[in-house]
């Protein structure tokens, strides 16, 4: 009889792969990763070798304690590697699978998608994440190529190819100072293009100059860096979430899946939220650069958060090191008193540590910059979440909330 698990109490080990490092055909103004190329100026080509690809795939699969293994390919722009690279990766995955089930997901800006790419993704059941920031006016505000030309038209051509070939895809949408002002235009766009799985990523960056040419601040650096102009404000973020939620809860529950709403309901239920930012602890998802360097997190690719290199340490040694364990547990331990006493701690968990550079009303450091927006959102959705939680506990569908709101059996009063 075949065992269904390799270590029943273990968690999967995740390391996201950067096969081209930070190399990209776009130059999005708010990109947090583009400047990471400055960390590797001594490398003439930021391209993962076939030798490293094989070493990583063998070790990554072998380090898993579960029967399912997920590979996540990230950039830079992942499609700047030729299709042959990913075909080779799949051959190696089969070679080293050792009976495990292998899944792949890939994040792309969508501009380089072709029929050939889409056929490959469909035939091999890859999940494709596409970066798109809403309608053309919003998307093209910051997502331009290196010549300063807008990218929306090419992205939509790519999305239409994914649809044509029946590829499973979802959207990663950055919420910034501009598109946050138009939440319903933003949300309705995704419904119009029939995108049923959407992740909102609020952009918050601070500017601190480095000698190597980088200009984005890490959490470990001074807290006084000036906020980047494109950053979404706490008030914008709260209003954005509440406005879209009000539309979604009346019309779209069970039809359109918005990650933050799903994660909020999971936390309301006492389940795992499925996204690191809203979990009590993080640190379970590392990232490996094109040369084998491993970092604590995709948003912490700074020298001070480098765990080592796969040529000198194993993935297990790095991802289960005391240093990485401390990185993950500090998400909770470093919360200020205001957070630990907050009614919505269970739902928020302080969000991502990278955004915790504000001070509380008492002057304590470590408050999330977006706290005010999140608090507004959680306070707003609480009665709806209570209803959906009750439905789930009675083995009923959360989507029943739409009927309850329409027939008046659920009345929300603030």
UniProtKB/Swiss-Prot annotation:
One Pfam family here: Radical_SAM
Positions of S-adenosyl-L-methionine binding: 30, 76, 131, 143
NCBIfam families: PRK13745.1, rSAM_more_4Fe4S, sulfatase_rSAM
EC number(s) per entry: 1.1.98.7
Chain residues that bind [4Fe-4S] cluster 2: 276, 282, 297, 352
Binding-site list for [4Fe-4S] cluster 1: 24, 28, 31
Top-rank EC class of the record's enzyme: oxidoreductase
Cofactor binding, note field: Binds 3 [4Fe-4S] clusters. The first cluster is coordinated with 3 cysteines and an exchangeable S-adenosyl-L-methionine.
This protein's name: Serine-type anaerobic sulfatase-maturating enzyme
Annotated family: Belongs to the radical SAM superfamily. Anaerobic sulfatase-maturating enzyme family.
Effect in UniProt of substituting residue 282 to A: Still contains 4Fe-4S but lacks activity
Keyword field: 4Fe-4S, Iron, Iron-sulfur, Metal-binding, Oxidoreductase, S-adenosyl-L-methionine
Pathway(s) it belongs to: Protein modification; sulfatase oxidation
GO terms assigned for molecular function: 4 iron, 4 sulfur cluster binding; metal ion binding; oxidoreductase activity
Domain Radical SAM core: residue ranges: 5-250
Function: Involved in 'Ser-type' sulfatase maturation under anaerobic conditions. Links the heparin and the chondroitin sulfate utilization pathways which contribute to the colonization of the intestinal tract. May catalyze the activation of chondro-6-sulfatase, i.e. the post-translational modification of a specific serine residue into 3-oxoalanine (also known as C(alpha)-formylglycine (FGly)), by a free radical chemical mechanism initiated via the reductive cleavage of S-adenosyl-L-methionine (SAM).
InterPro entries cross-referenced by the UniProt entry: 4Fe4S-binding_SPASM_dom (IPR023885), Aldolase_TIM (IPR013785), Anaerob_Ser_sulfatase-maturase (IPR034491), rSAM (IPR007197), SPASM_anSME (IPR047207), Sulphatase_maturase_rSAM (IPR023867)
Organism: Bacteroides thetaiotaomicron (strain ATCC 29148 / DSM 2079 / JCM 5827 / CCUG 10774 / NCTC 10582 / VPI-5482 / E50)
Cofactor(s) demanded: [4Fe-4S] cluster
Residue numbers binding [4Fe-4S] cluster 3: 339, 342, 348, 371
Catalytic reaction equation(s): L-seryl-[sulfatase] + S-adenosyl-L-methionine = 3-oxo-L-alanyl-[sulfatase] + 5'-deoxyadenosine + L-methionine + H(+)
Key word Disulfide bond present: no
Active site residues per record: 298
């Amino acid at each position: 009889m075949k065992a269904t698990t390799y270590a029943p109490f273990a968690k999967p080990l995740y390391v996201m792969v950067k096969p081209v490092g930070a190399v990209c055909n776009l130059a999005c103004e708010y990109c947090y990763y583009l400047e990471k190329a400055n960390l590797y100026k001594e490398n003439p080509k930021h391209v993962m070798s076939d030798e490293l690809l094989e070493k990583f795939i063998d070790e990554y699969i072998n380090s898993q304690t579960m029967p399912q293994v997920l590979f996540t390919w990230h950039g830079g722009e992942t499609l700047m590697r030729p299709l042959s690279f990913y075909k080779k990766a799949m051959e190696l995955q089969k070679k080293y699978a050792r009976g495990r089930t292998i899944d792949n997901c890939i994040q792309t800006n969508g501009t380089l998608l072709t029929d050939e790419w889409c056929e490959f993704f469909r035939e091999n059941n890859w999940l494709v994440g596409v970066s798109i920031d809403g309608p053309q006016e919003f998307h093209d505000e910051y997502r331009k190529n290196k010549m300063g030309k807008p990218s929306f038209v090419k992205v939509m051509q790519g999305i239409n190819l994914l649809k044509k070939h029946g590829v499973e895809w979802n959207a990663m949408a950055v919420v910034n100072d501009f598109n946050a002002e138009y939440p319903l235009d933003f949300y309705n766009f995704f419904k119009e293009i029939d995108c049923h799985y959407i992740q909102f990523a609020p952009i918050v960056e601070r500017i601190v100059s480095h000698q190597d040419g980088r200009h984005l601040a890490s959490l470990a650096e001074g807290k006084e860096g000036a906020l980047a102009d494109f950053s979404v404000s706490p008030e914008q973020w709260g209003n954005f979430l509440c406005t879209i939620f009000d539309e979604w809860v009346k019309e779209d529950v069970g039809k359109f899946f918005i990650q933050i709403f799903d994660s909020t309901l999971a936390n309301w239920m006492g389940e795992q939220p499925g996204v690191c930012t809203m979990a009590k602890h993080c640190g379970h998802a590392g990232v490996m650069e094109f040369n084998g360097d491993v970092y604590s997190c995709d948003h912490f690719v700074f020298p001070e958060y480098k765990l080592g290199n796969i040529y000198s340490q194993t993935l297990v040694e790095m991802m289960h090191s005391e240093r990485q364990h401390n990185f993950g547990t500090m998400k909770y331990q470093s919360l200020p008193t205001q957070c630990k006493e907050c009614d919505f701690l269970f739902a928020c968990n302080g969000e991502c540590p990278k955004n915790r550079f504000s001070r509380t009303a008492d002057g304590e450091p470590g408050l999330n910059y977006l706290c005010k927006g999140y608090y507004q959102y959680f306070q707003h959705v609480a009665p709806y979440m209570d209803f959906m939680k009750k439905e789930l506990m009675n083995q009923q569908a959360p989507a029943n909330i739409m009927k309850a709101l329409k027939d008046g059996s659920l009345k929300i009063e603030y």
